[in-house]
């Protein structure tokens, strides 16, 4: 993957305890929060792990879905399948120069060192779970915007950008 040619963004929602998933499920349902994801990723390249793809069961509509899997010969109908993040870049050529990483925990951890930015919804509650979002190093990322959304479940949506130097 050539970081100069492709801009990589992580898109995630996590609980106050960094939980992003419990088995194949997202442990919350927040009206409006999924709209942020759709707005950011529509008509873009979206990378997800195999387990996330299997929990959804189909490609994301109006997106070029790439599934990252270590399983040789893995097939995901309607999606590109790659074994490493470095193989994702060629699949972005006809879909623009932005790539959005959208679950799971291992994929986030692999992509974070290459990320230009992070779109993160932080839910103001703790949840049971077995998948966690990696810690963002304040020396590497800075908050460029943040908005708290009050509702049945309160969350803060923040945009982080990689610091230069």
Curated annotation (Swiss-Prot):
Known pathway: Cofactor biosynthesis; tetrahydrofolate biosynthesis; 5,6,7,8-tetrahydrofolate from 7,8-dihydrofolate: step 1/1
Protein name: Dihydrofolate reductase type A13
EC number: 1.5.1.3
Species per Swiss-Prot/TrEMBL record: Escherichia coli
Residue ranges annotated for the DHFR domain, each copy included: 7-162
Function, in words: Key enzyme in folate metabolism. Catalyzes an essential reaction for de novo glycine and purine synthesis, and for DNA precursor synthesis.
Keywords: Antibiotic resistance, Methotrexate resistance, NADP, One-carbon metabolism, Oxidoreductase, Trimethoprim resistance
SUPFAM superfamilies: Dihydrofolate reductase-like
Disulfide bonds: none
GO cellular component: cytosol
Family matches, as InterPro entries: DHFR, DHFR-like_dom_sf, DHFR_CS, DHFR_dom
NCBIfam families hit by this protein: trim_DfrA12_A21 (NF000055)
Keyword Oxidoreductase: yes
Record carries keyword Oxidoreductase: yes
Entry's family note: Belongs to the dihydrofolate reductase family.
Molecular function terms from GO: dihydrofolate reductase activity; NADP binding
One GO term of the biological process aspect: folic acid metabolic process
Subunit structure, interactors included: Homodimer.
Catalytic activities: (6S)-5,6,7,8-tetrahydrofolate + NADP(+) = 7,8-dihydrofolate + NADPH + H(+)
């Amino acid at each position: 993957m050539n970081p100069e040619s492709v801009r990589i963004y992580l898109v995630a929602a996590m609980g106050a305890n960094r939980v992003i998933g419990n088995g194949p499920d997202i442990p919350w349902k927040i009206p409006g929060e999924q709209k942020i994801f759709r707005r950011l990723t529509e008509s873009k390249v979206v990378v997800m792990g195999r387990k996330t793809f299997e929990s959804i069961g189909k490609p994301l509509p109006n997106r070029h879905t790439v599934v990252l899997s270590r399983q040789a010969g893995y097939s995901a109908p309607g999606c590109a399948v790659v074994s490493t993040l470095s193989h994702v870049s060629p699949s972005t050529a006809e879909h623009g120069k932005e790539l959005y990483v959208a679950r799971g925990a291992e994929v986030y951890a692999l992509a974070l060192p290459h990320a230009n930015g992070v779109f993160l919804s932080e839910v103001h509650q703790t949840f049971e779970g077995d998948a966690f979002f990696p810690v963002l190093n304040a020396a590497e990322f800075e908050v460029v915007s943040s908005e708290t959304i009050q509702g049945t479940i309160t969350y803060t949506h923040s945009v982080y950008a990689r610091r230069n130097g």
